[in-house]
């Protein structure tokens, strides 16, 4: 019987785990090295501009609402959000633009016309992606892949009976290229590989299901911005009696005879019947479990992509931009080869611009916008980031200024910069990778670290570096899996 739990890290996975355990009557403590909750999902303000620091895309809101419903609370009283009518604005170097509607039929009608693509190509693609999701959701996303009982259920038999459906023998790019005729449409759907920090030229065709989450379920924005997800779950956890200790660094997970006893913090040991690490799995082993060898297969796994992010206060409004904006590169393949083969950034690269002031006007002064400008980069292998950031900044400004027909440099009212080394420093993400390990192999789902220790009893893992993967929705599901495992 587990009566007490200690969660290391107050990221989105840690918060969701603490909530689920507290609902069951378990006394939960959360220790967090930073002075605030949220991990990557935080916010800050400069000169009247508010910025969401980390994840900017919100899908599957029902998985947030589930936590309130489990606690017998009305989600509408504590967490409000709205669906976006336009999912994303896409821009290509030849000045082609496509403002992607969220509704499927509207998307197909507009995309077919813009790209001279047959409507049935889209509908067939969406149907196959939906089938993949429905067949594998229970098996791959909502259960541990490292327990025998998972593979003995009817869901497994059903999933295995449709192996050809998953396109595991193809890359995502190959699956997209075989379905669409226009290279721009292929590039648009290739982009979804970046949602888990992978390359469309390496990750499997299974990953067409990623776009299903956005296309079928929609894209949303919380009232007040992405940070409201963190704040609402933090308040829910406190109402449930979860005890938080901020500015508190975990030093070691204490064990005896391969069983968890608690966590050492400074000169104190917080005792607990179970420990859940929301910390990246690599530093969990390296820093907190020195008494055990770090699993070599975890350290050797290829990290996902990282990012350099420029937070710019822009003293002008751009009506042609929306909440989510993508400025594509000319050569997508070269871009990903640079990232994963050369651990570099290509000369021509894709730029993502997120502007929450489009939906939350108070996020920027009147007549201005808050730009979150992101470029995918390799993880930190010791590159000269100072030189790279300087180069990226100049090239981003040149690219966006050209495509928006406006000199952006004089419009920058304030600036903050986030690099992979800073990401690791602030969030303990190994090498600054945003999603733990990459999914550049067809077997990636099975190679991610399980949500429990196979050696240490009552030690569990949640968050983006373990099963089922990175991103807000999957971090929330990792909490659900830990909750179920801890009942055993």
Where does each model-flagged region fall?
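Rossmann-like flavin
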Residues: 93-203
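Helical element adjacent to the flavin cofactor pocket in flavoenzyme catalytic cores
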Residues: 209-260
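A glycine-rich dinucleotide-binding beta-alpha-beta segment and adjacent secondary-structure elements
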Residues: 182-196, 346-352, 406-468
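Short beta-strand to alpha-helix junction loop
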Residues: 163-172, 214-235, 384-392
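Mid-domain catalytic core of redox enzymes
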Residues: 249-365
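C-terminal segments that line or cap access tunnels to active or ligand-binding sites in enzymes
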Residues: 315-424
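A conserved FAD-binding loop/helix module that cradles the flavin
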Residues: 55, 464-486
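N-terminal glycine-rich phosphate/pyrophosphate-binding loop and immediately adjacent elements
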Residues: 2-137
